[in-house]
Amino acid sequence: MPESQDIISQSIPSLTQFLGEEQARFPNIPTAIPIIIQAMATSARFISKAVVQSMIDKDVSFTESLNCSGDTQQKLDIVAQSFFLEALEATHEVCAVISEEADSVVPLRNKNARYIVALDPLDGSSNINVNSPIGTLFSIYQRISPSETPIQDADVLIPGKQQLAAGYMLYSTVNTLVYATIYGVHGFTYDPTVNQFFLTHPALRMPENGITYAINHSYLHTFPHYIQNYIAYCRRQELTSRYTGALVADFHRHLLEGGIYLYPPTYKRPKGKLRLMFECNVLAFIAEQAGGLATDGKQPILNIIPRHIHQCVPFYIGSKTMVKNLLNCVG
């Protein structure tokens, strides 16, 4: 390693160091939280390598199965879930996982553990074969029922405002980890030369306004009229449209630079497409801790009580001023 790079790495806290320091500053954070976040970060390194290897082996292929949301699964969706399940079980802090790629709750062998993780193992996996960004989303809940008993619906069907922490990994030109607790939002960048994440974006705050919006324009004619009116407003304001097809990537841009992401209901999907528990709650928690807003058009995302773990909702998230302007169009 060049000497200058070594000096830089030594002067910036690693994820491990920062989690320890944050635990010391805020003793109310359960000791399990940094352990779980560290396990997610470790798994992300392996997943990044698996994605690269799949490209080299030209094995970016789909399975013959659909997940519960009706999306065709790629092999890497299943591989990623396996990595995370193994890592989370090894923490001894997680009793169960709910995943976009699993039909129902996945119990782990840690019967005495008090925490449940909601997980989207590989967001935007259809982007892999064209080398576009992909991501992972996760959040942490505390179970309600007693330890050593089967997981109950009440343990998982709870509003997102009860999340203890939430985060995502973005696999792109550099690999990034962002996580949030009630004490703030922080971003880390992966340095492959030392195999660690380093704090590069401390105490993130989402700008109150922005100049970009993200929406799939190909469905514009199927959106409700109020969304069509809002898009017309964005165009009159000469806002820039940026849409990658990977939720994590689009949100990350808006977290850093300001903007709004929209996934409205359509004729074919009147209840929306994005999963409340695996995608919307995760990013809504991060956005609100960073000063942004997230809504389904009627109520804050974090207030919604899920009916089932794979529930879908309309989703609007981003800079506070832009989301409020959208809600004015909804009326």
Curated annotation (Swiss-Prot):
Its EC number is 3.1.3.11. Its cofactor is Mg(2+). Transmembrane segments: none annotated. Its main location: cytoplasm. Mg(2+) 1 binds at residues 100, 120, 122. GO terms for molecular function: fructose 1,6-bisphosphate 1-phosphatase activity; magnesium ion binding. CDD domains: FBPase. It is found in: Cytoplasm. Signal peptide: none annotated. Binds 2 magnesium ions per subunit. Pathway: Carbohydrate biosynthesis; gluconeogenesis. One of its GO terms (biological process) is fructose 6-phosphate metabolic process. It catalyses: beta-D-fructose 1,6-bisphosphate + H2O = beta-D-fructose 6-phosphate + phosphate. One of its GO terms (cellular component) is cytosol. Substrate binds at residues 123-126, 216, 243, 261-263, 273. Keywords: Carbohydrate metabolism, Cytoplasm, Hydrolase, Magnesium, Metal-binding. Belongs to the FBPase class 1 family. NCBIfam families: PRK09293.1-1. This is Fructose-1,6-bisphosphatase class 1. It comes from Amoebophilus asiaticus (strain 5a2). The lineage of its organism: Bacteria, Pseudomonadati, Bacteroidota, Cytophagia, Cytophagales. The gene is fbp.
